[in-house]
Amino acid sequence: MHYASAFAPSPKNARHNLIELRATLEDFRSTTTIPSTRPAPLHTFAGKVENGIVGKFGAEKAQRVIDSWRLLDTEYEHREFFGQDGTDPQTSNCYQFAHSYVPGLTVKPFWDIDEIAWTKKLAKSYKHIRKEFLDVTKDMSKLQQDGNNVWAGALTEEAGGYGEGWSTLVLKDRGIWDEVNCNLFPKTAQAVYNCGIPATEVFFAAMKPSTDIKLHSDFTNFVLTSHLAIDIPENGNNKCRLTIGDETRQWINGEVMVFDTSLMHDAINEADSMRYILMFRIWHPDLTEVENNALQYIYDCLSVPELLDDNEQVRTAAESQIETLRNFPK
């Protein structure tokens, strides 16, 4: 198994699966039963990761993360219908698909931002973030030259989800800040850092005019997605919209949204110019601090497998490397 791509938000088109499942709803309901699991052999990568989680965080406090890791190793995909009462499952898109799955987490299309304190702080920084973004992106050629992977498109295997009209400029990836790009957008990076956002990923996302993002799931339920709308064409005219499950909202400049992309979702830009947002992958609010740290440890092991080396000196050096990479750029 390619763990690095599996244990993370991975936008893949699930429309074909959804059509099949609607035709056999009883089969769909039966797949929501979570199978029993057992530890992977200690000599395998999966076994070493689990052993590391137990050693660092304790089996009891990190049990849901351990279960999630074991389920991934069995190639389990959680499927469940979350449509409101009275919703026709044959026409609804409110289905959850997740192969990176922590059992027992709350599922709802959009979260009330009044319940999430950092969203208010972020919204207050909107004008400064927008101004810096527009100033820096005036000269796209210079930005391309100075930055890392500026406006990179989705990977080939992901194109069925995000499509060719979507591209990103990363500030943080799997808990690691991109020093080069953060230094190009220092006010934005500092604002994000000061807000205390529990983000594993932070990036600007662009969407070309007259394009859409097809119906898909990001296949991970232990992170939610958040958007700060930065530059929305025809702002307020419902030209740029996002649908999570069966609920549709439009992006409005300066507003923050938090939603669950393990549910089927799609998006559209019907305007004649680019749409820009600042996007976050954040830990699910139901997770404990220990669970967040245990999940981050898995990310770290995927990025720096030397963390699992049998040699203590190699492990110590890897831990130092991870700590350095996680530091906020000065």
What is each stretch, according to the model?
Residues 1-13:
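N-terminal chloroplast transit peptides
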Residues 171, 206, 230, 244, ...:
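Hydrophobic side chains in beta-strands
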Residues 6, 21-23:
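Proteolytic processing junctions in secreted/extracellular precursors
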Residues 24-203, 207-217, 289-330:
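Fe(II)/2-oxoglutarate oxygenase catalytic core
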Residues 2, 216, 265-266:
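Histidine-centered active-site/metal-ligand motif
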Residues 206-208, 218-235:
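Short, conserved beta-strand element in jelly-roll/cupin
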Residues 126, 166, 199-201, 210, ...:
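Extracellular structured ligand-interaction cores
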Residues 222, 234-330:
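Catalytic core of Fe(II)/2-oxoglutarate
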